[in-house]
Amino acid sequence: QIFIPLTVGGAINTLEDFDRVLKAGADKVSVNSGAIKDPGLIGAAAKKYGDQCVVLSMDVARVDGKYHLFTKGGREDTGLDALEWAVRGEAGGAGEIVLNSIDTDGVKRGFDLEMLEALSKRVSLPIIASGGAGKMEDFKTLFTLPGVDAGLAASIFHFGEVDIGNLKRYLTENGVPVRL
């Protein structure tokens, strides 16, 4: 028997949406656009289910030298300062943050370390980095950054560019503690 926490996101706009996915078996709920539309949703969900259940998902890109928060899968600039939004999310009850850098997503040249560092200086929540992994070394570099707790990648695994087992062994050999 193995425990793998399941986080579900997408079209989470109300407490009823939280109810629906949690009753279906999710352990955590990731919310982005719904929280932007209704910032009180984060606090209401944290109060009802606990902050460990609420994941603030952020799609962020640089606009005129500032970090802007995007919605609708990264297609619409909200004009909100992403770092300020993260601080509000933490104060509102989010338990962790997934930061997807639109600037590096799919580019496969490494995670957006500058953006992650800026975020980690503003919040004390666990941060999960997303967007940019292209090789095993990118994960090693990521995990040397203080304040980053996890890394998320998709395409490098889907297309067989990096094998998960090999990545875990590589990280272990390079002093990054992972479960083998």
PLM segments and residue spans:
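Short beta->alpha connector loops at strand-helix junctions that form conserved
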Residues: 10, 31-34, 154
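Catalytic cores of alpha/beta
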Residues: 6-7, 12-25, 114-151
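Conserved anion-binding
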Residues: 22, 26-99, 103-104
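C-terminal helical cap(s) of enzyme catalytic domains, especially alpha/beta-barrels
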Residues: 42-49, 141-180
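Alpha-helix-loop-beta-strand connector modules within alpha/beta enzyme cores
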Residues: 1-7, 43-59, 108-135, 175-176
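Generic structural signal for well-ordered alpha-helices
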Residues: 18, 39-43, 83-87, 113-117, ...
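Short secondary-structure boundary/capping elements
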Residues: 10-13, 37, 77-81, 108-111, ...
